[in-house]
Amino acid sequence: MRVGIGYDVHRLVEGRKLIVGGVEIPHEKGLLGHSDADVLLHAIKDALLGAVALGDIGKHFPDTDEKYKGESSLYLLNEVGRMLAEKAYVANNIDATIIAQEPKMAPYIELMRRNIAEVLGIKVEQVNIKATTTEGIGFVGRGEGIAAQAIVSVGQSLG
């Protein structure tokens, strides 16, 4: 078994959709980034890549490459899953935390879990997502951005 951790943060801006965990969430602001800026999936992808010593998402999906501009992070998560499979690894467990003052994430967490599990070909029970605030402290507390962190375990695939 191997373990990886990931962290990501993006600024909230007007004129962008808010996509977290592959779910479009109604909000007056969205996350700024080269792809769809899905902070949760970025943290999970970094954790998965780290667990198998493949670097990070910046190495594989650089923000200087136009082919990733506006790209769905679910698609990129699928690519990371493919990279794991090529090394004969599969995700055993994902535990992630979204850190956002607003909007509330609770209504969307189950759909996020299903999205992630489906893309990686694992059971929903292997994916846990939590959400918390910073009690009004810092850039997240002021509503300037959203952060996410993830820890994953991966094991050798049997097939």
UniProtKB/Swiss-Prot annotation:
It holds the Pfam family YgbB. GO terms for biological process: isopentenyl diphosphate biosynthetic process, methylerythritol 4-phosphate pathway; terpenoid biosynthetic process. Pathway: Isoprenoid biosynthesis; isopentenyl diphosphate biosynthesis via DXP pathway; isopentenyl diphosphate from 1-deoxy-D-xylulose 5-phosphate: step 4/6. The keyword Lyase applies. Keywords: Isoprene biosynthesis, Lyase, Metal-binding. The record marks 34, 133 as: Transition state stabilizer. Homotrimer. It comes from the Bacteria. This is 2-C-methyl-D-erythritol 2,4-cyclodiphosphate synthase. Binds 1 divalent metal cation per subunit. CDD domains: MECDP_synthase. One of its GO terms (molecular function) is metal ion binding. It comes from Alkaliphilus metalliredigens (strain QYMF). Its cofactor is a divalent metal cation. InterPro entries: MECDP_synthase (IPR003526), MECDP_synthase_CS (IPR020555), MECDP_synthase_sf (IPR036571). Its EC number is 4.6.1.12. It catalyses: 4-CDP-2-C-methyl-D-erythritol 2-phosphate = 2-C-methyl-D-erythritol 2,4-cyclic diphosphate + CMP. Belongs to the IspF family. A divalent metal cation binds at residues 8, 10, 42. Involved in the biosynthesis of isopentenyl diphosphate (IPP) and dimethylallyl diphosphate (DMAPP), two major building blocks of isoprenoid compounds. Catalyzes the conversion of 4-diphosphocytidyl-2-C-methyl-D-erythritol 2-phosphate (CDP-ME2P) to 2-C-methyl-D-erythritol 2,4-cyclodiphosphate (ME-CPP) with a corresponding release of cytidine 5-monophosphate (CMP). 4-CDP-2-C-methyl-D-erythritol 2-phosphate binds at residues 8-10, 34-35, 56-58, 61-65, 100-106, 132-135, 139, 142. The gene is ispF. The keyword Chaperone does not apply.
